[in-house]
């Protein structure tokens, strides 16, 4: 805890409000709310915390806060601040997904579509459906029952849907507005929960057709009834009042929360939403934040009723969402809440099993590696590999593994600038010097371990630059390969002795992943650079092709192979004159 934070903690008010945690770059990394700011913010810097909260606190260099007049104001402000800053530790609903609806378009000849975007266009929207498959299945059923127009633009002749009896072909025939209105009214009746009545009417028509010996028509109606049954049976009936409602329940353990949402549409449980995320506040506060975010998403449907557990503030949720919020004590609604809660507990249990397995592969492997090398746990590992072909286009690459996992946004590529010919030792010296000079200059975090994919000469070159030029003391180890170029061992120490590692240990598997990744990254960069240089050299002797047009061609075609397949017209599309294009094609044939 720095001096600035200590001073700010001493003057925090005992009022509700929001707080914004910031890192070294003054970036907001977490937004929270509190009933009493003084108690909440101080709690981060006192006492013990789980690993994820410790990581958050370790990055906090400053904070600010905003006082509000009530808890509900704090909640609303928190939601707005999360939207504004998108902090990396506020992870519960970052995907911002929108749910699909079935839409009847407002056109002379309306059509049915599945869409995720609700617009003020006088179209009629039904939903939401929690996944696109449920929406598409329902639309497919409606397409079979009601022959509305299918084509986006009207063709000049009938299509297959007309021959299947699923379209009235307004492209050819004059379909009255009254006919379209009747079809739309039937679809609306179906989507508003009237499918049982529609099924009854179809059954009566089927029996009537059979009595009149219209067996083909009776079979067609029977198939429609069966299709309604097969589609609607997938949606479990839960309530008898055909209302739309969402059921929320949550469970929490070991610093994690799971929220389950059951979507009830026209009295049916059609799907659920499962969200798992780390907790940084009290469970009730986390749940309120989740609900505020859940319904603040664009186009997210707010039903007429929401069911929530007894443990949350019903009045605050009603103020926040402006809809009916109930906390049922018994009956079918209470059973739904209990079922959602049970599902939340099960999902948490599964999450912990996966976390344990993942931690064994990542943090567990990091611990094993640290023990084997007799160093502090190498949470941050930076690995280097050189790549060239007989000294041509020499490059180097660095990959970063944080907590045993690739941290790709910090990968770096290096073109070798000061070395001529195939000199891996000098190349390694240059890259290590460039990398850690920049680290010192920009005050970036030093790694806990540096891995060199190379022999003793490259490892010693890296150590020499670090210790004798940059005065840095960072553990350096080398990745040893066998005759098949596979990870074999690790060497470290003054004499670079082999470090014994079990071949079936998580530490060994981690080294394999690191070695494969740094090799892949270096090779792909070398191929990219070699291809670009080959591209440039082919164009050097073509009159009319200067640096500007080289870049133009590279951007348009991307490779020599694609250029060789191109025609004069293709080159002209790329902005190359016809005469120059002809010269290019001749040059590419050589």
Curated annotation (Swiss-Prot):
SUPFAM superfamilies: C-terminal UvrC-binding domain of UvrB (SSF46600), GIY-YIG endonuclease (SSF82771), RuvA domain 2-like (SSF47781). The lineage of its organism: Bacteria, Bacillati, Bacillota, Bacilli, Bacillales. Its main location: cytoplasm. GO terms for cellular component: cytoplasm; excinuclease repair complex. GO terms for molecular function: DNA binding; excinuclease ABC activity. It holds the Pfam family UvrC_RNaseH. It comes from Bacillus pumilus (strain SAFR-032). This is UvrABC system protein C. Residues 14-91 form the GIY-YIG domain. The UvrABC repair system catalyzes the recognition and processing of DNA lesions. UvrC both incises the 5' and 3' sides of the lesion. The N-terminal half is responsible for the 3' incision and the C-terminal half is responsible for the 5' incision. Keywords: Cytoplasm, DNA damage, DNA excision, DNA repair, Excision nuclease, SOS response.
